Swiss-Prot record:
CDD domains: HAD_PMM. Mg(2+) 2 binds at residues 220, 225. It comes from the Eukaryota. The gene is PMM. Its EC number is 5.4.2.8. The keyword Cytoplasm applies. It comes from Nicotiana benthamiana. Keywords: Cytoplasm, Isomerase, Magnesium, Metal-binding. Catalyzes the interconversion of mannose-6-phosphate to mannose-1-phosphate, the precursor for the synthesis of GDP-mannose. GDP-mannose is an essential sugar nucleotide for the synthesis of D-mannose-containing cell wall polysaccharides (galactomannans and glucomannans), glycolipids, glycoproteins and the antioxidant L-ascorbate. Can complement the yeast temperature-sensitive mutant sec53-6. It is an enzyme of class 5 (isomerase). This is Phosphomannomutase.
Amino acid sequence: MAARKPGLIALFDVDGTLTAPRKEVTPEMLKFMKELRKVVTVGVVGGSDLVKISEQLGKTVTTDYDYCFSENGLVAHKDGKLIGTQSLKSFLGDEKLKEFINFTLHYIADLDIPIKRGTFIEFRSGMLNVSPIGRDCSQEERDEFEKYDKVHKIRQTMVSVLREKFAHLNLTFSIGGQISFDVFPQGWDKTYCLRYLEEFNEIHFFGDKTYKGGNDHEIYESERTVGHTVTSPEDTVKQCSEQFLGKDNGSS
């Protein structure tokens, strides 16, 4: 077995990189990652919380990889142990949070859109997820809202109002998925996890949403990483085989 190269880590996005979007990881990918860990240190970084990442990558995710960063690294595990947490509540404080949430709920209440359901704001430890239609809608309703939003720009308009109103809080607004957008302090994107990787001088990051506006963009562009854009889990395996295992995995 080849020895691990010191100072080198391969860091992976989850959705669209290690798994198909919102799907569970395949046994083949788990086996490949196990092989990869023999030659390089391996970490995963996802925007979702640990519960959702565990649903996709398995319950032993914090020990299957050397590093596991959930919520972009706001919750950080190394070798299965929790090494750091940061929360929106402690960062902003309850008064500012309440001001933002109250304004947002009033805005949604006055919004004239075809349907509304429930759970308009989901409070996560590192971000707020805001959905004008409400996260309790069905898949069919999601699809309909996405089409409606493309025409009427509901989310885009809402974000520009909130950005102006709460400019003093230095928040980042990231529109993603079909029905919602995320709100978090500036710098709390995936580059946040890099503070835990000071010992590595070569950080290879693999992600699918590396374009401007995508949630892999900042870490892909960071001067601390070597960025790789992938198109699917199969492409991830192919690129890693060539990069780290010295073989072409295209003909399997």
